[in-house]
Swiss-Prot record:
Its EC number is 2.7.1.23. This is NAD kinase. It is an enzyme of class 2 (transferase). InterPro entries: ATP-NAD_kinase_N, ATP-NAD_kinase_PpnK-typ_C, NAD/diacylglycerol_kinase_sf, NADK. Its cofactor is a divalent metal cation. Its main location: cytoplasm. NAD(+) binds at residues 46-47, 116-117, 146, 154, 157-162, 218. Belongs to the NAD kinase family. It comes from Brucella melitensis biotype 1 (strain ATCC 23456 / CCUG 17765 / NCTC 10094 / 16M). Involved in the regulation of the intracellular balance of NAD and NADP, and is a key enzyme in the biosynthesis of NADP. Catalyzes specifically the phosphorylation on 2'-hydroxyl of the adenosine moiety of NAD to yield NADP.
Length: 257
């Protein structure tokens, strides 16, 4: 007999493990079309969750993830039993994405949303040279580096963390501006920015030092400038088990050794 206390729509990464989990869950709890669902259940790793967050942005449908992938920082533990009860008891966190506007010399500007981060990185062996402006004021005349990123709290545990950037609580009204292998200023380790600012990054010597920009997995090659800000009127809700909340996850990650 199916437990139908919640109308659930399941999405999976398509791997053998996630498809098997989806089959078992659908048999037990049923499956409805996304537009009829109370909750979206994502099965896979963090990549699957990021895709679900993009797909269901601004639909008002919370997303509950269960880990059937290799990286699952945004996912809950996979347990078949008592899924509706776990969902109803879960903590809700609101994710607000960034919007990137990337300009090039030979094409119209490209606009894309990013749940995790907007990153710039060098195309070749030549280091990137980047001028950074915050709300119209130049804060760094020239950053010489392999790359730089603007990360959301949700993305602060991903690429940002691997580049020695800070981990941010989901509710923190902040963005992390983090360099990748900075050469000059050598001791500049990045900055924490109020979430409402507009960050502009102008690329210098672009013919000699080409740079690509990426909003999560949306890449634009050979950019001349990139503007990043919090996307207005865009949000999605993610659900975490109470015994494994986001706060607990970031504390665990920071004391990992």
């Amino acid at each position: 007999m199916k437990d139908t206390s919640l109308a659930l729509h399941f999405v999976s990464s398509g791997t053998k493990e996630s498809l098997s989990a989806q089959k078992d869950l659908v048999e037990r709890y049923g499956h409805v079309a996304a537009e009829d669902a109370d909750i979206i259940v994502a099965l896979g790793g963090d990549g699957t969750m990021l895709q679900a967050l993009r797909d269901f942005m601004n639909t008002g449908k919370p997303i509950y993830g269960m880990n059937r992938g290799s990286v699952g920082f945004l996912m809950n533990e996979f347990v078949i039993e008592n899924l509706p009860e776990r969902i109803l008891a879960a903590q809700m966190e609101t994710i607000r994405p960034l919007v990137m506007v990337a300009e090039t010399d030979d094409a119209p500007p490209v606009e894309a949303l990013a749940i995790n981060e907007v990153s710039l990185f060098r195309q070749s062996y030549q280091a990137a040279r980047i001028r950074i402006t915050i709300d119209g004021k130049v804060r760094l005349q020239e950053l010489v580096c392999d790359g730089v990123m603007v990360a959301t709290p949700a993305g602060s545990t991903a690429y940002n963390l691997s580049a020695q950037g800070p981990i941010l609580p989901l509710e923190a009204p902040l963005l992390a501006l983090t360099p990748v292998s900075p050469f000059r200023p050598r001791r500049w380790g990045g900055a924490l920015l109020p979430k409402h600012v507009t960050v502009r990054m102008d690329l210098l010597e672009t013919e000699k030092r080409p740079v690509n920009a990426v909003a999560d997995n949306n890449e634009v090659k050979s950019v001349t400038s990139v503007t990043v800000r919090e996307a207005p009127n865009s949000q999605v809700t993610i659900l975490f088990d109470k015994n494994h909340s986001w706060d607990e996850r970031i504390l665990t990650e920071q004391f990992r050794h």
